[in-house]
């Protein structure tokens, strides 16, 4: 499913957030421009898709993504990322993360339809783009996030380093 949930501790240690990070399916996707093998393309519905058959694992896409959303599948030797569960959404189902979220915190829908549930929530909750300064025009928006979350999210999971059962990740490199 290629979603990473980052455990982020606020700098003053008064708040902990579990923040899901997925591919933002950017309108101006840096990964698409960076891929030398043209394995990344935009679908008609706006999704950014990696064709595993064309991926030559040059890794430029991994470096180009400002959200850290692309990882390397070492077994298949390809880059991969969230595709909004195309296999589900093509048959009218929500992505797995949305349908399995116990708190209903994830919403999927058509942002171009002002009557859709997601469009109404975006307006009501004042949802914002993650790392708006990157000017990628992402299709994924967040409610109630703060700048400190963005700054910590790509650096890995911030947990007690004495906890040996924790796997720290940074761009799919296990530490």
Language-model segment annotations:
Residues 1-175:
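Non-ligating segments of multi-cofactor redox enzymes
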């Amino acid at each position: 499913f290629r979603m990473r949930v980052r455990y982020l501790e606020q700098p003053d240690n008064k708040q902990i957030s579990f923040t899901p990070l997925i591919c933002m399916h950017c309108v101006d996707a840096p990964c698409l421009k960076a891929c030398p093998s043209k394995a990344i393309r935009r679908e008609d519905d706006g999704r950014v898709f990696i064709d595993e058959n064309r991926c030559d694992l040059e890794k430029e896409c991994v470096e180009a993504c400002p959200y850290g959303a692309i990882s390397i599948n070492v077994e298949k030797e390809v880059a991969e990322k969230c595709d909004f569960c195309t296999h589900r959404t093509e048959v009218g189902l929500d992505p797995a993360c949305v349908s399995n979220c116990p708190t209903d915190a994830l919403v999927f829908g058509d942002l171009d339809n002002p009557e859709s549930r997601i469009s109404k929530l975006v307006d009501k909750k004042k949802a914002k783009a993650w790392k708006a300064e990157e000017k990628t025009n992402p299709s994924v928006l967040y409610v109630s996030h703060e700048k400190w979350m963005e700054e910590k999210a790509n650096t890995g999971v911030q947990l007690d380093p004495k906890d040996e059962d924790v796997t720290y990740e940074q761009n799919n490199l296990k530490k």
